[in-house]
A protein has these predicted regions:
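Auxiliary alpha/beta "docking" domains used to position bulky ligands
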Residues: 1-188
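Iron-sulfur cluster-binding cysteine motifs and their immediate structural context
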Residues: 19-22, 32, 194-211
Length: 211
């Protein structure tokens, strides 16, 4: 596929994704990511995953998108903003707080509906193979999002977007389309440690490491 055609197709896909309700659309390759897979294995070997048994990576699937779809060439990374209109830290200081993401409808259901609409259109118009994922498969979403240019993993280990901060739900479409990847994002945290100071459980003993 000529580069001009690939660029035009990316624009068409991006516009369609925005139409169905996503706020960020980026593209990256489906290549394995051994560096981040190694970091995850070290995290698990130190027992820092707690009772999150689903993070297990013994079969090596995390960090290797091709284990989920061997024929995939491109991953379309999608982000949906769920940021509130008010600062949740400054309200109801004398009451227990429920995480913003849990105050509305289950985001898995919301995003899957949007993704199915987008994926159906993509499969019908481009005659390509696709698979969709919304935080339910062994995928290292944050490293993929950084590789696609959506944002970077901050010192709190969450994804940070220049436009949306850390208020993004992530989802992916794996496809056999061979599209030009976007540029990866770089770390812009610098000397800032606001997230570490704000952590209510002091789980961030050092930058980029959550206990």
């Amino acid at each position: 596929m000529p580069e001009k055609v690939r660029a035009e197709l990316k624009t068409i896909i991006r516009n369609r994704a925005l139409e169905v309700g996503f706020d960020v659309v980026r593209f990256t390759t489906a290549d394995p990511d051994p560096l981040n897979a190694k970091a995850l294995n070290e995290f698990i070997s130190q027992g820092r995953q707690g009772d999150m048994a689903w993070l297990d990576n013994k079969n090596g699937r995390r960090g290797n998108p091709l284990a989920l779809m061997p024929e995939a060439k491109t991953i379309i990374m999608l982000g949906a903003n769920y940021g509130p209109n008010i600062d949740p830290i400054e309200i109801q200081n004398n009451k227990g707080k429920i995480s913003i993401y849990a105050r509305g409808r289950d985001y898995h259901d919301v995003l899957k509906k949007k993704m199915r609409k987008l994926a159906r259109w993509l499969a019908e118009t481009q005659k390509c193979g696709i698979k969709i994922f919304v935080d339910t498969a062994p995928i290292m979403e944050k490293p993929l999002a950084q590789k696609a240019g959506i944002g970077w993993q901050g010192k709190h280990t969450n994804l940070v977007s220049r436009e949306f901060g850390s208020w993004l739900f992530l989802a992916e479409i794996f496809t056999t389309l061979n599209l030009t990847p976007d540029l990866a994002e770089t770390d812009h945290c610098g000397s800032c440690e606001l997230c570490m100071k704000a952590c209510p459980t002091d789980a961030l003993a050092e930058p980029y490491r959550i206990d």
